[in-house]
Every structure is written in C-alpha cells, then in structure tokens.
Amino acid sequence: MLYIQHIITTCMYYVKLCKKQNEKLLKIYNLGQINTKTYEYKRQLIMSDENMFLDIVKICICILIGKDSTEKLYNYIKNIEFKRWTTTKEFKEILEEIQLRKR
C-alpha cells in the first residue's frame, strides 16, 4: 500500500502544478498576450490534466479503503492520453503569438 500513498502524493503535486499553470495562463491572458480562443483551449487542457490526476487520487483512496482494485487503477492509467499544453511545441506557439502581438 506504500506505492498507493506515493501515487497519491505525486498526483497531488501535479494538481498543484496544474493550478500554478492555470494562474500563469490567466496572468498572460489578462496582460492581453494571448487571445480568448487560445486561452480557453489551453485552460481546458490544464483542467483536463488536473481532473485526471484527481481521478487517480480518488481511485487510490478507494483502493486503500477496499472499494476498488489495483486493476481499475492500472486500466485507468493505461488509457490516459497526455495532451498537456506545456509541450515544447505548444509553448513555442504561445511565445510566437505573444511576440507577434508586440509588433
């Protein structure tokens, strides 16, 4: 069960990172450095990541109290498609958009 606690701790760390990313995104949006469509798209990706990590935590807690199995956790994690807005390519696109707006 120690590994389940480690998974919970790690996921909560990433939930905090998602919240920080959301704050940074809101800040650059409020400064007028990205448009509304880009902001909404990136915000949805961050929220999706945050919800994914929270789902993993919920499954882990259910495993600890005996309501779920590790197989459910394995299947959930196995089927995750990572679509982070923080990938290098997408981050470069945001920076390019900011630079274009400054011209």
Language model regions located:
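Flexible coil/linker segments and helix-coil junctions enriched in charged and small residues
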Residues: 25-47
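Acidic, low-complexity, intrinsically disordered interaction modules
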Residues: 38, 45-83, 88
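Short intrinsically disordered terminal tails
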Residues: 1-2, 47, 100-103
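Short amphipathic alpha-helical heptad-repeat segments
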Residues: 3-7, 11-22, 50
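Short, leucine/isoleucine-rich alpha-helical interaction segments at C-terminal helix-coil junctions
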Residues: 80, 97-101
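Secreted/luminal cysteine- and crosslink-motif detector
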Residues: 12, 19, 40, 61-63
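Intrinsic disorder/low-complexity segments enriched in small, polar and charged residues
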Residues: 27-30, 75, 103
